[in-house]
Design a protein with these regions (language model features):
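Active-site core segments that coordinate phosphate-bearing ligands/cofactors
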Residues: 1-166
Length: 167
């Protein structure tokens, strides 16, 4: 077993005996976008909410006009494994728009993904590509922010319903 053991990751048996998969994941990516929609976009029909929020976020510059978000709204898994970690908006003021807030949310999740990729790089296993699945694949701004922040190209899987389907 040549597995690299690191407490920031978790491991599981893989497809053939003696192999394993090292795994990582954020606690609240998609859930956080749904929370934001439900709290701050009640004026929008649900079917239009995410495209409208993405369009508003696209009007905000990179860095969301100085607004930052820590995406730990339900604790965090990789790499800090802290169920008590808390999320927060930093730098919020009266000039910020809903678009700034949503862009900060997207960028905060992307920085969380970057934290994961740096964990693998610390272990001399830097990712060379990211596989994108789930609802976020419909948000071009989210995909681009993740690629820009991590410096890693993404592949959007053909079936993007979610990681639980093994895609």
């Amino acid at each position: 077993d040549t597995r690299v053991r690191d407490p920031r990751l978790w491991y599981a048996p893989w497809l053939t005996p003696g192999t394993h998969a090292s795994m990582a994941g954020l606690a609240t990516s998609g859930t956080l976008t749904h929370w934001f929609r439900d709290q701050f976009a009640r004026d929008l029909p649900k079917a239009d909410a995410f495209p409208t929020l993405a369009a508003e976020a696209a009007e905000s510059p990179k860095g969301a006009n100085g607004l930052l978000l820590l995406p730990y709204f339900s604790g965090e898994r990789t790499p800090i494994h802290d169920t008590n970690a808390k999320g927060a908006f930093f730098g919020l003021n009266l000039t910020h728009t809903r678009g700034d807030m949503y862009r900060a949310l997207i960028e905060g999740i992307a920085y969380g993904t970057n934290h994961v990729t740096r964990t693998y790089a610390d272990l001399n296993q830097p990712p060379t590509r990211l596989l994108a699945v789930g609802g976020g694949t419909k948000n071009q701004l989210w995909l681009q922010a993740t690629s820009d922040i991590t410096g890693i190209d993404q592949i959007v899987c053909e079936k993007t319903v979610g990681a639980s389907y093994g895609n």
